[in-house]
Amino acid sequence: MVGAGINSRDFKERVPALVDAGVDVLVVDSSDGFSEWQYETIRWIKETYNEEVKVGGGNVVDKEGFLYLVKAGADFVKVGIGGGSICITREQKGIGRGQATALIEVCQARQEYFEQTGIYIPICSDGGLVHDYHMTLALAMGADFLMMGRYFARFDESPSKKLAIGN
């Protein structure tokens, strides 16, 4: 399986190239996924490629955001705004929510949606996962999979050479 992150600006050029190269999964990577841009991007991908490629949307922090992305056609939804180690969305836009609260609400919305439609939408917990037990907590709260940057960034092991910048 091959995945790629895209944005909501040049997707009409990038997505065809990625699909032609063999990508299986796309995610519209945005700090605030509850937007018309993301909705239009997901709709275009689903209308153009249908089930040929899976597409995820996010990030959202509540039921309304989850349902908005699902209505657009998202195959999975990323949850979390402001909890990531390099995220500045809370400071820049004044939005965000505690990761546990956001994850619980979105997973409850997902369960309600599943009970109404029979369609299960996987949830990715993205942000704020620092320690080992945070992974267990996120999965116990309903996440199907996790996105982690800070956790792995602290290790010396890497598939590439270490690059020292500055002092």
Regions inferred by a protein language model and the residue ranges of each:
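Alpha/beta enzyme core
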Residues: 1-126, 130-166
